[in-house]
């Protein structure tokens, strides 16, 4: 059954949007009546309110399709995991290209472009964010890359958020130094971020609840608490996905429970920066939950000699 849906978004329909949305709703109603077995309940994940109103006028019962989709996507098949590994290989090749290009005078944008170039050249698709910053722009986190020239002695922190080959997301973070020897303060920040990552990966086990995991995770020192990353751990697949596991200090107000199960692909997050401090360290590792524990998907080297 092949049908052409009338375009009801404003660019295509202008002031005919409502009438064309009604034509769309008529088609959906006909499909439901013909193939729904008497069930007029329809899961919808994304739809304009004009089209939503038109469907409800046809007496369709709309339910949240995003919840259905997110839960279905949470556990990956072996075929999906192979595609995600292929995406990660491209992502890490891009990281290598960035690290090789890192030198004083290169702009944040020019360095970030190395990741884009590698991704496109190797069959990837796009990158969701522009999260690379240097020196004083690394703290607090979430500044987009800019035309700032990176200086000798700067920390450079980034988060890939890369949609690689086959449409799968590779989401890992590293922090590097533009120069030869990190300062004692840079080493201290890095050591704390690394400890958080390793402790929290070790806390992940199949069968634990999200609450269990949050409680077992590394307790952030007060110095770094106000600038903490927004989540401890989140799902990843075609994008950042369910679940979102909150810090223990945030769990009661912002968290929700669920279960860690084999086949989930998760990202373990860390940002360490003092309030008012000059720099911050961003690390993130992408992992698979297995029957017995955790397998790392991201393998790009850490600065172990800083620890």
Q: Model-derived features: where do they sit?
A:
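Active-site neighborhoods and metal-handling regions in enzymes and metal-associated proteins
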Residues: 1-307
């Amino acid at each position: 059954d092949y049908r052409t849906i009338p375009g009801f978004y404003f660019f295509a329909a202008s002031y005919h949007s409502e009438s064309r949305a009604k034509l769309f709703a008529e088609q959906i109603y006909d499909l439901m009546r013909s193939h729904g077995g008497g069930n007029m309940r329809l899961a919808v994940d994304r739809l304009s309110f004009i089209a939503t109103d038109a469907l409800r006028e046809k007496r369709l019962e709309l339910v949240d399709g995003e919840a259905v989709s997110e839960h279905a996507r949470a556990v990956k098949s072996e075929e999906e995991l192979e595609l995600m590994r292929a995406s990660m290989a491209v992502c890490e090749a891009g990281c290598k290209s960035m690290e090789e290009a890192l030198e004083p005078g290169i702009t944040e944008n020019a360095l970030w472009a190395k990741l884009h170039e590698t991704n496109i050249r190797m069959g990837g698709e796009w990158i969701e964010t522009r999260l690379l910053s240097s020196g004083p722009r690394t703290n607090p986190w979430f500044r987009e890359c800019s035309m700032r020239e990176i200086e000798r002695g700067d920390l450079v922190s980034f988060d890939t958020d890369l949609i690689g080959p086959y449409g799968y997301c590779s989401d890992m973070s590293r922090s590097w130094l533009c120069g030869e020897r990190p300062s004692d303060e840079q080493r201290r920040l890095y050591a704390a971020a690394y400890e958080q990552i390793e402790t929290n990966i070790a806390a992940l086990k199949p069968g634990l609840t999200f609450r269990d995991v949050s409680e077992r995770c590394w307790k952030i020192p007060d110095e770094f608490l106000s600038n903490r990353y927004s989540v401890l751990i989140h799902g990843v697949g075609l994008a950042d996905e369910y679940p979102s596991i909150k810090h223990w200090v945030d769990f009661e107000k912002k968290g929700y429970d669920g279960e860690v199960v084999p086949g989930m692909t998760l990202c373990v997050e860390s940002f360490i920066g003092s309030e008012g401090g000059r720099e911050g360290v961003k690390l993130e590792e992408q992992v698979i939950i297995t029957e017995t524990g955790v397998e790392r998907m991201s393998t790009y080297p850490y600065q172990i000699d800083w620890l």
